[in-house]
């Protein structure tokens, strides 16, 4: 699979481990930064990753910040991105199978590296089920994006 991986400063070490695992398993994995522990802003890396997924440079993404929450909020602002923060394997599989999630968010300060690598492996290995009920629900979410995704007037 072709993946993009990005993090803020809190996730640099975990990002390196994730990239190493993905490459060793035969995936293509682009490192979208950061590569420093100097403080940076996670929305900048969420944007780079979201644009890579939306632009077709990656099929899916893995985005890492301290908690996983901020990165997830930022990524979900991009129309067509379905990001989920997962810190267990069941959620990582289920979010793809049922919700066709295309960005996995991890909290480097929440999850240990070994569990994180299992979560990433399960996320990458999962496929959208395509079940009618899930397609119907995703169509409703997509309609929300179309109706409510426009900027609010001042």
List each model region and its residues.
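Structural motif
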Residues: 38-47
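Short amphipathic alpha-helical segments
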Residues: 16-19, 73-77, 117
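C-terminal binding/interaction regions
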Residues: 2-6, 10-13, 89-154
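Glycine-rich phosphate/diphosphate-binding loop of Rossmann-like nucleotide-binding domains
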Residues: 1-25, 29
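A short beta-strand-loop structural module common to alpha/beta enzyme folds
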Residues: 28-39
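Helix-adjacent hinge/juxtasegments
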Residues: 48-86
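Short, structured coil segments at secondary-structure junctions
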Residues: 25, 78-79, 99
């Amino acid at each position: 699979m072709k993946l993009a991986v990005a993090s803020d400063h809190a996730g640099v070490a975990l990002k390196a481990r994730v990239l190493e695992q993905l490459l060793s398993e035969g995936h293509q994995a682009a490192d979208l930064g950061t590569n420093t522990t100097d403080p940076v802003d996670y929305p900048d890396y969420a944007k780079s990753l979201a644009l890579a997924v939306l632009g077709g440079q990656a099929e899916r993404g893995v985005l890492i910040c301290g908690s996983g929450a901020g990165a997830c909020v930022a990524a979900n602002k991009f129309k067509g991105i379905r990001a989920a923060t997962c810190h267990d394997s069941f959620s990582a599989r289920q979010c793809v199978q049922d919700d066709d999630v295309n960005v996995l968010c991890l909290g480097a300060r929440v999850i240990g590296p070994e569990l994180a690598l299992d979560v990433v492996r399960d996320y990458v290995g999962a496929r959208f089920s395509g079940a009618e009920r899930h397609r119907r629900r995703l169509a409703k979410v997509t309609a929300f994006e179309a109706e409510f995704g426009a900027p609010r007037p001042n």
